[in-house]
From Swiss-Prot:
The protein, known as: Methyltransferase/ribosomally synthesized type I borosin cyclic peptide precursor sveMA
Source species taxonomy: Eukaryota, Fungi, Dikarya, Basidiomycota, Agaricomycotina
This protein's UniProt keywords: Methylation, Methyltransferase, S-adenosyl-L-methionine, Transferase
Species whose genome carries this gene: Serendipita vermifera subsp. bescii (Mycorrhizal fungus)
Function: Fusion protein of the methyltransferase sveM and a type I borosin core peptide; part of the gene cluster that mediates the biosynthesis of a type I borosin, a highly methylated cyclic peptide with potent biological activities. Type I borosins derive from the C-terminus of the fusion protein, and it is the same protein that methylates its own C-terminus using S-adenosyl methionine (SAM). The C-terminus is subsequently cleaved off and macrocyclized by a prolyloligopeptidase to give the final product.
Quaternary assembly: Homodimer.
Length: 408
């Protein structure tokens, strides 16, 4: 069915609850829990389940009832999606909650969203903290340096996906290799070990990772050689879909100096991407840089004489503007009222400056950025952006913050 240009009554929002109990749940997701007509969920701990059930304004439904030990998981996924869709078709504003990020290794969420959009309903996904995010934090990894390759373990095997020995490699669901139902006995795990040994050798290190869920839980970070993965006592510890393998780089990649020249990077300014802190699990051919080399020491020595640039913009807004923007960001129902009639909403807010009112009535992020920040010089002079400058901000304002890149 072709998508409708006018969404029907009823909507579907899919959100993630994160991995660690409640700690990873976003304010946006909490707002949706409190406002949805019906909430469907799959979570991995009773505390998150209790929070959902106690904060939802409407009925809640545990989608895990559609799992069964001998039941094909894809059948369960289709049923989970259809149950949510049926509620949307009834005209309900439906929230589907999935642990972790709702779009990463989650089939029913994508299926339900696609069908809802195809049938003309409003549908969107809200992000959540994934197991990958959790692992990057716990292991101290940056996927940008030296790059990252991720595969689901079974798909990695059946499609003969390549590992990259010069990047981070992540294998998901290593505790359920070849499993299509809910019986995670992992009898095919040896096939995964065979493949890893073939590609990287028996002595390369692998980190078995499982992020902590409950406050009383402990994160698992166990390091083994690939050969040690064959030990029965190790195999017993890798037996659920929560188990993830981090496979560190073995080698350092060569630099394409021809491309460096084509990119126009001056040779005298170019140096290798810094690799600090060193990767404690990497192979012997993977190089790293010291914490305080010549360039780092020079950067530190400049701190004593650092002067804030004239172009730096600091937060500068009325208390009313700060409050209304925080409220709009954390209260979905309030934002809907704002969008329904911006002029009336803004006029009812006390304490806004006239320019802040104009920006809020425009309803664009660019205009809001412009009235909520200013250089120190403009603040001292009492200079504000003009209406014309706010109009120029009607388009989406792109903010780019580079924290990891080739150093030039």
């Amino acid at each position: 069915m072709a998508s409708s240009t006018h969404p029907k009554r009823g909507s579907l929002t899919i959100a993630g609850t994160g991995i660690a109990t409640l700690a990873h749940m976003t304010l946006e997701t909490v707002s949706h829990i409190k406002e949805a007509d019906k909430v469907y969920y799959i979570v991995t701990d009773p505390v998150t389940q209790a929070f959902i059930e106690e904060n939802a304004k409407g009925p809640t439904f545990d989608l895990s009832v559609y799992y069964d030990a001998d039941k094909y998981r894809y059948t369960s996924y289709v049923q989970m999606a259809e149950v949510m869709l049926n509620a949307v078709r009834e005209g309900c504003n439906v929230l589907g909650l999935f642990y972790g990020h709702p779009g990463i290794f989650v089939s029913p969420s994508h299926r339900a969203l696609a069908i809802a959009r195809e049938e003309g309903y409003e549908a969107r996904m809200l992000p959540g903290v994934s197991a990958e995010d959790y692992m990057f934090a716990d292991l101290g990894l940056d996927p940008a340096l030296p790059g990252c390759v991720c595969y689901e373990a079974t798909n990695f095997l059946i499609r003969n996906k390549p590992l990259n020995p010069a990047t981070h490699n992540i294998l998901w669901q290593v505790g359920a290799v070849g499993i299509t139902a809910m019986d995670f006995e992992n009898s095919k795990f040896s096939l995964l070990v065979d493949r890893l040994e073939r590609d990287l050798g028996p002595n390369h290190k692998v980190v078995h990772y499982v992020g902590a869920v409950l406050p009383q839980s402990a994160t698992i970070m166990e390091t083994y050689t690939i050969a040690e993965l064959r030990k029965p006592e190790v195999i017993k510890r890798i037996s659920t879909t929560s188990s993830t393998f981090y496979i560190p780089p073995r080698d350092s990649e060569a630099i394409d100096y021809d491309m460096v020249a084509r990119l126009g990077i001056p040779p005298e300014k170019y140096r290798k991407i810094p690799s600090y802190p060193p990767n404690q699990w990497a192979g012997p051919n993977y190089t790293s840089t010291p914490a305080y080399g010549p360039e780092e020491k020079a950067a530190v020595s400049q701190l004593a004489n650092h002067v804030v640039p004239n172009s730096y913009k600091t937060l500068h807004a009325s208390p009313a503007m700060k409050k209304v923007m925080i409220d709009l960001a954390t209260d979905r129902s309030l934002y809907k009222k704002y969008e329904a009639n911006r002029d009336a909403f803004v006029d009812a807010v006390k304490g806004l400056t006239e320019l802040e009112k104009v920006a809020l009535k425009m309803g664009t992020d660019g205009s809001v950025y412009k009235v909520m920040s200013a250089t120190q010089a403009d603040i001292e002079l009492g200079k504000e952006p003009s209406i014309e400058e706010l109009e120029e901000g009607r388009g989406r304002l792109l903010l780019v913050v580079i924290t990891a890149a080739v150093v030039v």
